[in-house]
Amino acid sequence: MTPPENKNLVDENKELIQEVLKAYPEKSRKKREKHLNVHEENKSDCGVKSNIKSVPGVMTARGCAYAGSKGVVWGPIKDMIHISHGPVGCGYWSWSGRRNYYVGVTGINSFGTMHFTSDFQERDIVFGGDKKLTKLIEELDVLFPLNRGVSIQSECPIGLIGDDIEAVAKKTSKQIGKPVVPLRCEGFRGVSQSLGHHIANDAIRDWIFPEYDKLKKENRLDFEPSPYDVALIGDYNIGGDAWASRMLLEEMGLRVVAQWSGDGTLNELIQGPAAKLVLIHCYRSMNYICRSLEEQYGMPWMEFNFFGPTKIAASLREIAAKFDSKIQENAEKVIAKYTPVMNAVLDKYRPRLEGNTVMLYVGGLRPRHVVPAFEDLGIKVVGTGYEFAHNDDYKRTTHYIDNATIIYDDVTAYEFEEFVKAKKPDLIASGIKEKYVFQKMGLPFRQMHSWDYSGPYHGYDGFAIFARDMDLALNSPTWSLIGAPWKKAAAKAKAAA
């Protein structure tokens, strides 16, 4: 039963939402009202609408379908060349976008931080760019002979003029003897980067899995199966996250045969269907391919969470339960090994952080997955929301958040600022677009997209870094220096009086 004081807080937060909405014209207010709510315990849903186009004219943090395909799913595949097919301006999302760490020699056998563009000009819009794209792929294969394949990431003009990139892909694939994957991920498609994820997943299904089927049929799969093979999917190795996750999986006796897509390779994409279990970290961006693997190959899949010691231990046990007693015993040994280490981290940082509050606004999985990590440190989440979630994301979020938590979907810059002013959280955890706004308001901030150039945050080792970074953000002595001297003097005089 909800305590009376929490009932009051629910009502208070609902009133806050209505107050914030008053700034909009009636039509916009009605639209935005559906995306804002206060979570009430025992509800199976957060009660917000999602995956709907943003209200025209507002400041939204969303990206486009091209960003979802190139910047998230395909871009981190390190041994493929990813062509940004269109004007060079979209290159903002084309290189060094997400700190996807990888092992390899850039420009020789790895291309993760390189920018390849067809540099569309006006004449290409008029006459079409198929010949230019064909020549580009041929030249790139000569310049970088160790590439394993090419992906064509379409920008807006490609879809508008109707270039046949599929025909180019089939033709050039035969010429260079490597996979060439076309992606219709033009930025105008869909309402956010989420459709780009879906398009990217479908391209793996339609253009990569047939290669697996062919190799298996011809008995040419260079793969020795084991009963402990898993595919690690939806981890983009931001700051080394996938390595931290992989280390724990291997320590408990599992073999990671495919890592998608941070530090991943084309071969790992191809042999993904050979795994016994799919472990998905970022549900939003890769649940589509998990469902395809289940439908086509009968592969089971599960979402896991390696943020914070509480959820790490729970996830290790859930994963181990899918295997035999050997793996289950190993999981317990891994948990026992790291428990004293985590206790030492908590003993050091929890007293310094306990009682603080945080408001989250990120994409993907983090608005829910990082909640337990904050709670392990004694930090309470008072608001959370997604940039591009779907309804099932918000259903999954109910298992993570407390009663009276403010929920905001595709929150506008205005709304987020007003919520922060009213709730006065001690910390904001969001993205680069929000960072400097709140820092100028004198609020501690941590980036939850790129970890503010820190990390990893996954796994036991990552939690120690996470705790340190939250402590640095909240307890930095610089916060005592941001007040204007005349305001400090006035405050002292008032206190003395």
Curated annotation (Swiss-Prot):
[8Fe-7S] cluster binds at C64, C90, C156. It catalyses: N2 + 8 reduced [2Fe-2S]-[ferredoxin] + 16 ATP + 16 H2O = H2 + 8 oxidized [2Fe-2S]-[ferredoxin] + 2 NH4(+) + 16 ADP + 16 phosphate + 6 H(+). It is an enzyme of class 1 (oxidoreductase). Its cofactor is [8Fe-7S] cluster; [7Fe-Mo-9S-C-homocitryl] cluster. [7Fe-Mo-9S-C-homocitryl] cluster binds at C282, H449. Its EC number is 1.18.6.1. Keywords: ATP-binding, Iron, Iron-sulfur, Metal-binding, Molybdenum, Nitrogen fixation, Nucleotide-binding, Oxidoreductase. One of its GO terms (molecular function) is metal ion binding. Belongs to the NifD/NifK/NifE/NifN family. This is Nitrogenase molybdenum-iron protein alpha chain. It comes from Nostoc sp. (strain PCC 7120 / SAG 25.82 / UTEX 2576).
